[in-house]
Amino acid sequence: ECTRYMTGVSHTDPEVGTPFALKVMQRLNDACQEWKEKENIDFSLYGTPLESTTYKFAKCLQKRFGIIKGVTDRNYITNSYHVHVTEEINAFDKLKFESQFQKLSPGGAISYVEVPNMQNNIEAVLSVMKYIYDNIMYAELNTKSDYCQVCGYDGEIKIVEEEGSGKLVWECPNCGNRDQDKMSVARRTCGYIGTQFWNQGRTQEIKERVLHL
């Protein structure tokens, strides 16, 4: 969002966006080094995937700056330097792109690849894992593992917009069950797989994720 606001393009744009984003990351690292020398306390840059911050910061930015297309027009902001969840990119290109930002995140970093159910395509999983091992510091595969306790549906439970309120809710595509107490939904956020459901900002982000395989 920062890069898009400052340059008008995504940080995946090789001519303008990426060089600008890398300069921002380097400046943040330089600031950490300056603070370290001044305070004799270690500072480091961390590529955070904070759960509530993505929603909280989005609402604060909307309140302060209004709605800016491609910047503050969603109820979430992108985690650290990740490729935006709606941007079409394959798994290998995404990992290669984000690896250059991980090198500038000495305090910690993580990248994700969104995949469908891969239980019948282990060869593809191993291919991505090998690429991760050879090319990036830390990355994980996100898949869907849901279960409806009403009808026994075993597949991806969808996010839909509730009639009238516009609220995002989880719905079994087989029987229409929307009772969160009667379904098991697992999604990776903040580096771990959670099953406790999420705020509206994070739910919108999950809904808009595109697959990378």
For each predicted feature, which ranges?
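Long, C-terminal-biased catalytic regions of enzyme "large/alpha" subunits
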Residues: E1-L213
